[in-house]
Amino acid sequence: MAAGPAPPPGRPRAQMPHLRKMERVVVSMQDPDQGVKMRSQRLLVTVIPHAVTGSDVVQWLAQKFCVSEEEALHLGAVLVQHGYIYPLRDPRSLMLRPDETPYRFQTPYFWTSTLRPAAELDYAIYLAKKNIRKRGTLVDYEKDCYDRLHKKINHAWDLVLMQAREQLRAAKQRSKGDRLVIACQEQTYWLVNRPPPGAPDVLEQGPGRGSCAASRVLMTKSADFHKREIEYFRKALGRTRVKSSVCLEAYLSFCGQRGPHDPLVSGCLPSNPWISDNDAYWVMNAPTVAAPTKLRVERWGFSFRELLEDPVGRAHFMDFLGKEFSGENLSFWEACEELRYGAQAQVPTLVDAVYEQFLAPGAAHWVNIDSRTMEQTLEGLRQPHRYVLDDAQLHIYMLMKKDSYPRFLKSDMYKALLAEAGIPLEMKRRVFPFTWRPRHSSPSPALLPTPVEPTAACGPGGGDGVA
């Protein structure tokens, strides 16, 4: 039962190179001569053909790639988690057990790279079909998804139910073994593409994990890739270069601005806590402090990023935006940061909350976003993930950076903060100098006096030759 990785025409392949590598492994595992041994497996009264055991999969991977059994088990578990191998006895548990548990290879039609992205309409048909077959006894998270999709695509729900009933009617004409196999295949596909709450999303991609390298690999042998490369180098040749004197001047300006704020270069005030055993420096520079130091307030003027990374500076900036009736911009940026770094199980809830509070028509804290960015954001909300609001967040960030941030630096509030900020006094080391031990009690070998050899005129008793 060999399978080829070619997707059906008209469906673009996902730019995810690790999926291509796993597909090549799965294809080699199904080789009739050198692949994993397949046999018919009996489940109760049903016989499932072309099944493999978990121990055979681990043994084949260990022999094929010359790795230990532990590494082979991990590789097999990754294949199961990505839906290329699915269990027959417990389809909801995507785990590889190195025993006689029966598994089966996923058909190429349900490979993630073939059907990506997964459409909401297909998921609604799957849930409707499962709801009819089980007479409403869905899992809790599937019930929530079913209700949400019912509200979201209510205009096409008759089509969803009609498709579900037609598929169930066609399934009755198949054998019991085929029905079981197709049900396991569909369930595995949706467990990978719509994981339950709390389960890891193996297909999640961050902005840094984009398909830049993968697209280059796919385009290496094409003429379009070489045309793009020639155009890139032509633009690079015509680009104006910055003189070295200008670069050095910028480096000197940067170092001169940041030098007083570097504790290694300019020291710490009131004292270095690692030397003086006094934590006053840490107390004055705590994340939340009532009266920030002058150096800390000055750093807010270096860049907008410095202001946002400081909790105290962000709080004062929020007060300033509140006076200008634009505090919803910073609140939206903070909500996007919470979504980006929050728990995976809370991503759908956080996305809905941000949309209802900031982006929905008539929202309580509606933010001003251009129509193009709003369309891209609404398109991404159909399949929510932690990076779905990146475009809108960047738009609001640049709006605050170019408009609100310069006015904040010129405002009376920031000038008053600079005037009221204090400079810590240097702490004296000790009251009694004779009780103070120097940091380096032993002198450096380079500073030790060099011994002088006695001359011939000197006697053995001393340097003057007197016995």
Swiss-Prot record:
The keyword Glycosyltransferase does not apply. This is Regulator of G-protein signaling 11. GO terms for molecular function: G-protein beta-subunit binding; GTPase activator activity; GTPase activity. InterPro entries: DEP_dom, G-protein_gamma-like_dom, GGL_sf, RGS, RGS6/7/9/11, RGS6/7/9/11_DHEX_sf, RGS_DHEX, RGS_sf. Pfam families: DEP, G-gamma, RGS, RGS_DHEX. PROSITE patterns: DEP, RGS. Residues 299-414 form the RGS domain. PANTHER family: LP21163P, REGULATOR OF G-PROTEIN SIGNALING 11. Residues 219-282 form the G protein gamma domain. Heterodimer with Gbeta5. Interacts with RGS7BP, leading to regulate the subcellular location of the heterodimer formed with Gbeta5. Keywords: Signal transduction inhibitor. GO terms for cellular component: cytoplasm; neuron projection; plasma membrane; protein-containing complex. Residues 32-107 form the DEP domain. Inhibits signal transduction by increasing the GTPase activity of G protein alpha subunits thereby driving them into their inactive GDP-bound form. Residues 440-467 are annotated as: Disordered.
